[in-house]
UniProtKB/Swiss-Prot annotation:
Keyword ATP-binding: yes
Every RWD domain range: 430-531
Domain Helicase C-terminal span(s) in chain numbering: 845-1020
Remarks, miscellaneous: Present with 195 molecules/cell in log phase SD medium.
Keyword Membrane: no
Name by which UniProt lists this protein: Putative ATP-dependent RNA helicase YLR419W
Length: 1435
């Protein structure tokens, strides 16, 4: 029988008793209690339900029943209630939930009290109820919400209890932001699971605390010898006292800190012991510690580092070591590098979790463990001792000798006189006998022919142990100076000092080959006490000056600058050549061909202004010439100038004309057209210079070039503009290079002899340029366009009587339709409706306008073409499909036009299609770049897509918006080139006049500015911000500051004085469009990937993939690339392109192009670019002048080593790095046991550097340095931002893309693939990306998997997290990326990177091929080989 509980006794719920009859036993109950009649019982139940629900009509379940069923489903125990009577107020109950663990049989309980109850006020949501049953049901509702607030159970509750549920929901949401931890504890969907996890966490903490206490006890046991006079102290106690004393001085918190959970989930990396020793040995030889000291100029810096000193003492470094470290720029790195592992404070000790070594010392055989323990007495770690033992075939003697030699690698043994084993043993034993006789009783533990020990200081238990090595005495013996007593300890840093000075003594005395042990013992007896009393600095002055004489920077720089300037020195033409040119010109102007071309030129409107233009240019230094489209200004103005120079001045060589164009196609086209008009071959009198092609010669008078080329030329030789008329065309486009050229020209105007500036544009803000150039002279050329009739949206809607279905009117606002004359099914939208003013496109209306214009032209017997302007490729494809479906194919030839099409497809728009109306559906490419001669009508949606840069998160976003009035005018002008035209605008006249901006936003205000900053800096301009503030439109200051910070992060700008670093100077020498590409070229040469890096940069330089465009090919292209999926997007494209260039046969090449969907034009552009890059690299001296592809094997030694290629790509594109976060491991049960499951692609997360966090961090650092105000670290945003792989990537592998994301992406990029496969990125901790794209999410494109060591060696700055309390968790890259590793690994990699920078400088300033080089590059080569070995070791 169930035990009665308190609430059962107080419950007023009736019991269904069975009525009794005479002669039968009465039913159980209280004495004398009569059974209730059935009707009374039912009435009482109804009364109770009414009380609980506050209504007599409720027929659903009651809260207690719902709670009971919920607990039953979760396999919890029966719910119990703790009932309390609150005086006369009534009853309050608390539901008590419980769960019994089926394994341990332990029962866990959870009391579900009122979470809103406030002890101070004694008030809460639950008030005392009249009866116990009401109180019990109220407690059930409270418990239900607390364990199931995320469900819809409230829909099953009575109305009054539903109100309680809602009140609890409001309470939880209101307090969630302010006290998330407490709220999550109160409202827990599975409180018993949380209890178990809390127990485990508590147990783990207790275990760590016990381990910490045990470690502290161990440290206090060994007494450290600090003086030869018997000064012995407990190292643990000594450190602890210093910690307490120093803690008071440390009050500045570290800005960069991460919680324990973040460190637990961070990437782990370790160096194997051989790599660690390789790096350390190399660094000991090369580090110039003198250069790392704080100079006298920086005394103020030294004075402001008291907080840092206090922090180092708090970390328990010895005071004398801290004093020495404070002399250096990076004291912590100095200490971590120079202190032996054993003497590092406990905070930096190596834990078991800090290593990936497969061989654990504790798992070794006992004999091996004992050898390792003996070898550590030299002053090395167990790992170092084990590695030495393994490298010497487990021979203890040879391992001891090896470790001794490593202390002073420069000490050379006399290997020219090898000693036989017999001679070595004989010499060893003779010396032992002599020592025994001289120092009686001092020799002990002698093992025949192997080793022995000598007593040095009896009082301190210090002894000398020597090991015989083969070839002794011609080689060093193994030398150990130690206590050999676990109760006494000689600090390792003192051991290191003793042995270092001892070996220097042997080296200086040239004693190797003599009786070494005798000399060693004698020297130690005399000097060891002095060294123990005064060990001296960790770095003696003699060692700190080791690398000073190796530097010779100025000569190298001078030679590079000289070589780079040779190309751009201005050549003079001889008198003989001038005579030939004069004679050739005289003949040419008399030819019939020239005269016929003259007649063609005279038909252009510009011809009438020839004299005015020449006169205004002669009289003014700066001229602005505006002209309508088709006026001939681009082809004629430069010819007017040249004709005047040749005819009037007889100038055939002195004055040059440079004409810049914003696009390559324009520069080439104009050069060829002007050459034809002047009846010369392109490249002679008239030529062009674009990236990759220089089609000019010394006698060329008119040079067309892209604005970017002129910017790069001006970086190296401004004198090239002497006696030059610079014509800057299309200034209205306001590209970043055009704005920079205009600003530079203004600065150079009075500094360069004989230079004039001519600005040209179709539509431009004349007042802006007059303000920028005081005294600017202007001239306007009228065009020859025909009258154009304009129709705005209100006219179109009226003429077409356009209607929409009533159900579609929801897309428009309430007042946007004209209700007059509307029938029940259709409505008439107005031009000022929200739909149209927001820029949305009604494709039904667009198609009807095309049909309407076609019929109107047909009625006028006009066979001209129609251009439809749309914002993007997705919109063009949609419109083309609709037009093809709705129209009669016999009437229309619908042609798309955008930059992604092949040149062949683009050329289709120029053809005539007899009997059909040509309808060109285009982006703004048809606005200026391409002219369709037979166009008579334009239909303009008034929309365009432009890239906008957001410096806050360092991303660019493709934004669709209304175009400017100037662009509307340009589009309109396309309709009046051949006859009277029509211009239909799908926007209202009011929107055009009042909402559209006058001119387009300059590019300098909407793109990243790193390349601009570097270009300006390379010209010798110190204050870039001040210089650019004088531009036509100053760039946004936040974008400029972001550019400066990014260039500092990637190592091109020095953080202290904002000057170009060595690497920055090298990259600025190369006229490369992007600093990332410049870094890739330099790294490629140094690491033996020259040809492949040049090809990669050429592919990246074209800006798009080298495939035939179009959405119909997207999946085919991805399928081709997926053959190389494991290497990522860039290498997949590289392999396909490289295979093409390997083919020699032309027919096979053509087939390869077709099979792999490669664009012939883009491949040719890549080929042209590679030639240009080789020319640049030769010119600046990075490659020999006679270099041919693949001709020097060392420059291509790693061309098939994708590990090295990945690493240099990482260095080139940092900080474009994303961390790959895998989900928690899941296991699958099989017959052979549990097997780890591959993670689902949709569960993998990608994190990139948060630019908002970096900006805020800089702001806080400034505030702290200025001590202006306190900073709240809680306000710092998260260091990382989540990103997603773009579906076009070969690494994208999921079928879980939600429909909304897929729709948004398809609007920009077309349909996406939804195939699923095991993701490659699982194998790599990071991926690098070249570009990113923001739609509804941040997507990463062109991905390449990469490794942790690649990131550490080539990525951002490395710092140490010293904010922990027990142990250093690891290092932090660039303030945002925590990496778990032993601190010593961090400092070794950090110093190796410094040596790598030095190696880059040496190799580039004095290349190996330079025969006259006097600089020894062997050290640089060794550094590069070490880096290559480290990268290979991670695989």
């Amino acid at each position: 029988m169930a035990k009665k509980t308190k609430n059962n006794s107080k419950s007023s719920t009736p019991v269904n008793d069975v009525p009794t009859t005479a002669g039968k036993k009465k039913a159980k109950g209280k004495k004398g209690q009569e059974p209730e009649p059935e009707d009374d019982k039912r009435a009482k139940q109804q009364s109770n339900r009414a009380k609980v629900t506050s209504t007599a009509s409720w027929t659903g379940k009651l809260p207690h029943t719902i709670l009971h069923e919920t607990c039953q489903k979760r396999k919890w125990n029966k719910v119990e209630y703790d009932m309390k009577k609150i005086g006369d107020k009534g009853f309050i109950a608390i539901a008590v939930l419980s769960f019994t663990d089926p394994k341990t049989k332990e029962t866990l309980t959870a009391r579900m009290n009122d979470p809103t109850y406030d002890k101070a006020s004694g008030k809460g949501l639950v008030i005392p109820q009249e009866t116990p049953i009401e109180a019990r049901h109220m407690a059930s509702t409270i418990a239900l919400y607390r364990i199931a607030y995320n469900t819809n159970l409230h829909m099953m509750l009575p109305p009054n209890h539903r109100k309680t549920w809602y009140a609890l929901d409001d309470f939880r949401k209101d307090n969630l932001k302010t006290d998330e931890k407490r709220i999550n504890k109160l409202f827990d969907l599975d409180p018993f699971k949380t209890m178990v996890e809390d127990r485990k966490l508590k147990a783990q903490r207790e275990k760590e605390q016990v381990a910490q206490n045990n470690q502290a006890q161990k440290e206090q046991v060994a007494r450290t010898i600090l003086s030869s006079h018997g000064g012995i102290s407990s190292s643990g106690k000594d450190r602890q006292e210093r910690k307490v004393a120093s803690h008071k001085n440390s009050h500045n918190p570290s800005l960069v800190r991460f919680p324990k959970k973040v460190w637990e989930n961070s990437i782990f990396v370790d160096l194997d012991e051989s790599s660690r020793q390789l790096i350390e040995t190399s660094l000991k030889e090369k580090i110039d510690w003198q250069a790392k000291k704080i100079s006298h100029k920086n005394e103020t810096i030294a004075e402001n580092r008291e907080d840092l000193k206090a922090k180092l003492l708090t970390l328990q470094f010895r005071p004398k070591h801290v004093e020495e470290a404070m002399l250096y720029k990076d004291p912590l790195s100095f200490l971590l590098f120079n202190l032996p592992e054993d003497d590092l404070p406990p905070f930096f000790h190596k834990k078991k979790g800090d290593t990936k070594n497969k061989v654990e010392i504790t798992n070794l055989p006992l004999s091996t463990r004992m050898i390792v323990e003996r070898l550590t007495e030299i002053g090395v770690s167990s790992d170092e001792a084990l590695l030495a033992l393994q490298q010497n075939d487990m021979n203890e003697n040879e391992a001891a000798g090896f470790l001794t030699r490593e202390i002073l690698p420069t000490l050379n043994s006399n290997t020219n006189e090898p000693v036989s084993e017999t001679e070595s043993i004989e010499c060893w034993n003779q010396e032992l006998e002599s020592l025994e006789s001289i120092y009686e009783g001092c020799v002990m533990d002698a093992k025949e022919d192997s080793h022995y020990t000598l007593n040095l200081i009896e009082k301190l238990k210090i002894k000398l142990k020597v090991y015989r090595t083969k070839n002794y005495p011609a080689s060093l013996p193994g030398i150990v100076v130690s206590t050999f007593d676990k109760n006494y300890k000689l600090p390792d840093y003192i051991k290191k000092q003793i042995l270092t000075r001892l070996l220097h003594y042997l080296q200086e005395g040239n004693l190797i080959g003599d009786m070494l042990v005798y000399h060693i013992y004698e020297w130690l007896k005399e000097n060891i006490s002095k060294i123990i009393d005064n060990p001296g600095p960790l770095i003696p002055d003699s060692d700190s000056k080791g690398a000073i004489n190796k530097r010779n920077i100025s000569n190298g720089k001078r030679s590079i600058n000289n070589s780079s300037s040779r190309k751009f020195t201005k050549t003079t033409i001889s008198e003989d050549t001038l005579s030939v040119l004069r004679e050739e010109y005289t003949k040419r102007i008399k030819s019939s061909e020239y005269k016929s071309m003259q007649l063609v030129r005279e038909q252009l409107p510009a011809w009438k202004k020839q004299k005015v233009i020449i006169d205004i240019i002669n009289k003014n230094e700066v001229v602005l010439i505006t002209g309508e489209t088709g006026s001939g200004k681009s082809t004629q103005v430069v010819q007017f100038i040249l004709d005047f120079l040749q005819k009037e001045k007889g100038d055939f060589g002195k004055t040059k004309i440079v004409c810049t164009q914003p696009r390559r196609i324009s520069a080439i086209g104009l050069a060829e057209r002007v050459s034809d008009e002047r009846c010369v071959t392109c490249g002679e009198e008239v030529g062009y210079v674009i990236r990759g092609v220089n089609k000019t010669k010394a006698s060329t008078r008119i040079k067309f070039m892209t604005t970017g080329v002129l910017v790069r030329l001006l970086q190296n030789a401004r004198t090239m503009l002497e006696n030059t008329i610079v014509v800057i065309d299309e200034v209205h486009e306001r590209s970043i290079d055009t704005d920079l050229i205009v600003t530079l020209m203004k600065n150079l105007l009075h500094r360069v002899r004989g230079m004039k500036i001519v600005l040209m544009s179709a539509t431009v803000n004349v007042d802006l340029f007059k303000k920028f150039f005081p005294g600017l002279a202007t001239c306007h050329i009228e065009g020859r366009t025909f009258p154009i009739t304009d129709y705005f949206l209100e006219d179109i809607l009226s003429d077409l009587d356009f209607k929409i279905k009533r159900e579609k009117a929801l897309s428009y606002d309430d007042d946007s339709v004209d209700e007059r004359n509307n029938d029940d099914q259709y409505l008439k939208p107005r031009a000022d409706s929200k739909f149209f003013t927001s820029g949305q496109i009604n494709y039904d209306l667009l198609c009807q306008v095309v049909e309407y214009v076609h019929k109107r032209l047909k009625a006028a017997n006009d066979n001209g073409s129609i251009i439809v302007f749309l914002p993007g490729v997705g919109e063009i494809n949609k419109c083309c499909n609709l037009l093809a479906n709705k129209s009669n194919e016999a009437d229309f030839m619908v042609l798309p036009l955008h930059s992604a099409l092949t040149p062949e497809d683009q050329k289709r728009v120029f053809k005539k299609y007899h009997g059909k109306r040509k309808v060109v559906v285009s982006t703004n490419i048809a606005e200026t770049s391409i002219t369709i001669d037979d166009c008579v009508a334009t239909i303009d949606t008034g929309r365009a897509k432009s890239m906008f840069y957001n410096p806050k998160d360092n991303t660019t976003k493709l934004i669709e918006s209304f175009i400017s009035k100037a662009e509307v005018k340009q589009r309109r002008g396309r309709a009046g080139r051949v006859r009277e035209g029509l211009s239909y605008k799908l926007f209202s006249k009011n929107l055009y006049e009042n909402d559209m901006i006058s001119m387009p936003i300059p590019e300098i205000k909407r793109i990243p500015l790193e390349s601009l900053y570097l270009s300006v800096k390379a010209m010798g301009i110190k204050d870039v911000k001040a210089f650019l503030s004088t531009a036509l439109d100053a760039p946004p200051l936040p974008a400029l500051q972001k550019a400066e910070r990014i260039l500092t992060t990637i190592g091109l700008v020095d953080e202290s004085d904002k000057s170009l670093t060595q690497l920055g100077q090298f990259i600025s020498l190369m006229p490369v469009m992007d600093s990332k590409h410049g870094k890739l070229l330099i790294y490629g040469i140094l690491f033996g990937c020259t040809d492949i890096s040049v090809l990669l940069v050429s592919i990246l330089g074209i800006g798009v993939l080298p495939f035939i465009g179009g959405f119909e090919n997207r999946e085919k292209i991805k399928k081709l690339l997926c053959k190389y999926e494991s290497r990522g997007d860039l290498f997949a494209v590289l392999e396909i392109v490289r295979d093409y260039f390997k083919i020699k046969d032309s027919s096979i090449k053509r087939k390869y192009l077709r099979d792999n969907l490669l664009s012939y034009n883009k491949i040719n552009e890549i080929k042209s670019s590679t030639a240009q890059y080789y020319s640049i690299l030769k010119d600046v001296g990075f490659l020999p002048m006679d270099y041919k592809v693949g001709s020097i094997s060392d420059l291509n030694r790693n061309e098939r080593n994708f590990d090295i290629l990945r690493a240099i790509l990482t260095g080139a594109f940092y900080p474009h790095i994303a961390r790959v976060q895998l989900p928690d491991v899941k296991y699958l049960s099989t017959s052979s046991g549990a097997v780890e499951k591959d993670p689902e692609a949709k569960m993998i997360k990608y994190w990139i550097r948060s630019e908002e966090y970096q900006d805020k961090l800089e702001e806080y650092k400034t505030k702290i340095s200025q001590e202006t105000q306190k900073v709240d670290l809680e306000d710092l945003p998260l260091p990382a931002t989540r990103a997603f792989i773009h579906p076009s990537s070969v690494l994208f592998s999921t079928n879980s893309v939600n429909l909304e994301d897929a729709k948004l992406l398809s609007e920009v990029d077309g349909p996406i693939s939804r195939q699923s496969k095991i993701p490659t990125v699982v194998k790599y901790p990071f991926v690098l990306f070249t570009t990113s794209q923001v739609t509804n999410k941040l997507y990463l494109r062109d991905l390449t998997p990469t490794t942790t060591l690649s990131l550490l060696l080539f990525g951002g700055a490395i710092s140490y997290d010293i904010g922990g309390t027990i142990h250093s968790p690891g290092i932090v890259v660039d303030n945002w990326l925590p990496i778990r590793t032993w601190c010593k690994n961090g400092v070794l990699i950090k110093e190796l990177r410094t040596q790598l920078d030095e190696a880059i400088r040496k190799k580039l300033e004095s290349p190996d091929y330079a025969k006259k080089s006097q600089i020894d590059n062997s050290g640089a080569d060794k550094t590069l080989k070490i880096v290559e070995k480290i990268i290979a070791s991670e695989q």
